Amino acid sequence: MSWQHELDELRRREAFADELGGPDKVKRQKEGGRYTVRERVVLMADEGTFHESGKIAGTAEYDENNELSKLIPSNFIFGKATVNGRPVIIGGDDFTVRGGSADATIREKHNMCEEMANALRLPLIRMVEGSGGGGSVKTIETTGRANVPGIGGWELLVQNIGTIPRVALGLGSVAGLGAAHLAASHYSVMIKEKSALFVAGPPVVARIGQHLSKNELGGYQIQLKSGAVDHAVDTEEEAFECVRRFLSYLPNSVYELPARGSQDDDSNRKVDWLINTIPRNTRKIYKVRPIIDAVVDEGSFFEMGHQYGRSVITGFARLDGWPVAFMASNPYSYGGCWTAATCKKVTKFVDLAETFHLPVVYLVDCPGFQIGLEAEQNGTIKEGVRTMSAMWQTTTPWCAIILRNCFGVAGAAHKNGGRYCTRYAWPSGRWGSLPLEGGIEAAYRAEIDAADDPRAKQEEIEERLNKLRSPFRSAETFWIEEIIDPRDTRSLLCDFANTSAPLRESGPRSFSMRP
């Protein structure tokens, strides 16, 4: 007895699923310059490796003989694949079927996608377009009632954030629950001019008197600066490549350790120009990204959050092949001071490093927290202590190198002060409770005001204190462990990475990361 008839029926149903929302909807998707969800999976996954679950799930129509006449697939597909040879779970919204909204979705598929990633301990790549299975006002008509809002399965996403790498791509207009899925990730990327992200789109926002286009409301420039997404690129192909690169630094789950990459770059390579990079004039600034690129393995720095919290640069890199989480103060933004946005960015980044067992490297040039009315209105100190708490909760190996400024409470947060952390300083390092500039006026106000020539008195005090704040005086009392030749920075960092590698421990941490 053969079961060929049933297999033929299966193939017929799969053919319906391959048609997505139908030729007209697919054509509209393509005319908008966007790939269909199945094309995206092909581009993301290694060739021929995607194994789909629930392909023929959807809304079926039967004729008078109870024979299937039509099948509209659910607007979410998912399955297992490999990316650069590594197993992953891929899930994607099908915008050609009701714009990805709830009245054409099967919630169990969304939940099982998260469950599969968690159970198999594999990274999840989430391609989001539309409402991501979220509600539509048409749902009231199809169900005959209004639902009390709820998000079944969100607990799975929360668990996954602390267990597996979760990557999200915004590949069109994303709203409501779709926006939440995009934001609830370790790394997110949008497509310039073709993606938009918002809680509610322009037609809804118009009801409160704001008449905006999709890009004006939630385009990539808005969301990069808000920190809602980490990256924006020109094409979907570039977005998929960003995902590949991001995942290359991370383990499959917290139960594994990040893998070592190639060791093609000499770990003892000296960078001669670093000796001249920090200006002696403290009012002059310098570019720190070339310093990062010079000390890490060539071409290995992968920056995230470029437009948000800009006074600290964050990204992944490799040192002698070992993946590390790399932070660096950026003097070009608020002089390197920590703003409220910077604190939020650093908190998430430190939690990410701790979750996935990445040693942290921090190039420090921090004059302190941002000051002034804007800083107070933004709650900078509140965000700052949250960041400090995140740092003090870390157990992952940590290395700080003080390039220039290290002042105040934010300066003190260059490492976890409650445990051993590797620390060096360049000879350009300067530190204290407050910078002399500004601090002198506060500490010596009475003496300056009483002088016949207050300006001359202030200059006299400043000259006297400048002689005392030499980094060598701090080294004499072991307040700084080691002052190094900047040209040796790479070799010392590679030594840190090699020393740290066997100290890393797999498994979940004492706290679970939040998006």
Where in the sequence are the language-model features?
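Ligand-binding clefts of soluble mixed alpha/beta catalytic domains
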Residues: 1-515
